[in-house]
């Protein structure tokens, strides 16, 4: 998570869930604040909730840039353009790589309460409908205002399967 608007004051927060102890032993997170998501079994939405809950008390933060941990090779041009693009307070900013939207995405504070309310809805041990939650699909399907930024290069590789390495 990167927080704040513009490139002036940027704060890094890393939300870790499953295998968080192994990750903190093997990766130097430099100047990042590490947040632990104890409810990682719920899927990505619980990590988003963890980060937003932590940030919500700081009224100086007006937006959050959410990255996926399996996409370490985000072009710095994308980050800079997302942070510097003018947008409405109720408008999500999403990069489009050629013809495919992707991460990171900029979410204004306006949406945080709505995202914090999404929880695992199944208590019988079955997978929640949010287990494979996709943030971009959520905003598209809820007809939220979105500003799309076009980039003329391919979406960064997801390193989420053994075959990706």
Give the role of each language-model region.
Residues 31-42:
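Conserved donor nucleotide-binding strand/loop of the catalytic core
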């Amino acid at each position: 998570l990167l927080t704040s608007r513009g490139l002036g004051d940027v704060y890094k927060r890393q939300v870790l869930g499953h295998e968080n102890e192994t990750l903190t032993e093997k990766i130097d997170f430099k100047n990042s604040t590490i947040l632990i998501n104890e409810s990682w079994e719920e899927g990505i939405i619980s990590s988003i909730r963890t980060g937003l809950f932590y940030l919500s008390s700081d009224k100086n933060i007006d937006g959050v840039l959410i990255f996926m941990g399996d996409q370490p090779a985000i072009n710095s041009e994308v980050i800079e353009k997302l942070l510097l693009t003018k947008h409405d307070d109720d408008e999500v900013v999403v990069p489009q790589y050629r013809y495919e939207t992707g991460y990171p995405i900029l979410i204004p504070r306006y949406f945080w309460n709505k995202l914090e309310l999404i929880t695992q809805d199944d208590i019988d041990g079955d997978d929640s409908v949010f287990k494979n939650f996709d943030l971009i699909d959520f905003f598209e399907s809820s007809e939220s205002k979105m500003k799309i930024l076009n980039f003329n290069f391919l979406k960064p590789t997801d390193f989420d399967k053994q075959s990706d390495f």
